[in-house]
Amino acid sequence: MAIRKYKPTTPGRRGSSVADFAEITRSTPEKSLLRPLPKHGGRNNAGRITTRHIGGGHKRQYRVIDFKRNDKDGVLATVAHIEYDPNRTARIALLHFIDGTKRYIIAPNKLKQGDKIESGAQADIKPGNNLPLRNIPTGTVIHAIELRPGGGAKMGRSAGASVRLVAKDGPYAQLRLPSGEIRNVDARCRATIGEVGNAEQSNINWGKAGRMRWKGVRPTVRGVAMNPVDHPHGGGEGKTSGGRHPVSPWGQKEGRTRHINKPSDKLIVRRRNAGKKRK
């Protein structure tokens, strides 16, 4: 993938860029793997906003991705196409298995049309193959990693993501995550070899607010710019600083909100470099 820059023909295009989509081999998705994806505008069943800054955007259909890859062990598959997926930053690969079934997977870097891949404990160590962690050599770069055996991939799924298998210790495998955290994961969990493709995606300059609206992202408004009815920092004559310590729209103090002493904390060998202090 490469980044194509626009000429500054308008203020919105000045400095903006777009992916060149050179790796895409088909523009229409596989119909049998499409599902409806209705929009909710960040609202729950009561109509209340539960996730802010969501709304509008282009209509999408969900592509069913095989995150488990545990029911086709030993069955060879051919990469039929590399496709665009509007629901994620990574590209997806359409696999044609020799038994006639079709599946989508996250497309790893350097995977191309016509490649042969497979799953299972005896699979080769090459990009796109899926194996249990206990069967992967130490030092291998992996992605699409399960947290529970058979639970489906949860980590390392976005564009350019890569996790390194640094050690194996009894029933656990130690992984170094992109954040710098080192974490134990059950060695029976599966992972895919290689790093996720489309790594240049993070370098795209969207150029104007309208392109984010096409993606379904609404503006983020500062609390001090609101009215008192809308935010604890709202109101005041002229420009004010809010008059209190930073809080959320619901009065929660600024800072980390994750509960400490979670059961999964014992699996963390070394924490990532924290940007904000715990409160």
Curated annotation (Swiss-Prot):
Transmembrane segments: none annotated. InterPro entries: NA-bd_OB-fold (IPR012340), Rib_uL2_dom2 (IPR014722), Ribosomal_uL2 (IPR002171), Ribosomal_uL2_bac/org-type (IPR005880), Ribosomal_uL2_C (IPR022669), Ribosomal_uL2_CS (IPR022671), Ribosomal_uL2_dom3 (IPR014726), Ribosomal_uL2_RNA-bd_dom (IPR022666). It comes from the Bacteria. Pfam families: Ribosomal_L2, Ribosomal_L2_C. Residues 269-279 have a biased composition (Basic residues). Residues 32-53, 225-279 are annotated as: Disordered. GO terms for cellular component: large ribosomal subunit. GO terms for biological process: cytoplasmic translation. The keyword Ribosomal protein applies. Residues 253-268 have a biased composition (Basic and acidic residues). PROSITE patterns: RIBOSOMAL_L2. GO terms for molecular function: rRNA binding; structural constituent of ribosome; transferase activity. Keywords: Ribonucleoprotein, Ribosomal protein, RNA-binding, rRNA-binding. One of the primary rRNA binding proteins. Required for association of the 30S and 50S subunits to form the 70S ribosome, for tRNA binding and peptide bond formation. It has been suggested to have peptidyltransferase activity; this is somewhat controversial. Makes several contacts with the 16S rRNA in the 70S ribosome. Part of the 50S ribosomal subunit. Forms a bridge to the 30S subunit in the 70S ribosome. Belongs to the universal ribosomal protein uL2 family. This is Large ribosomal subunit protein uL2. The gene is rplB.
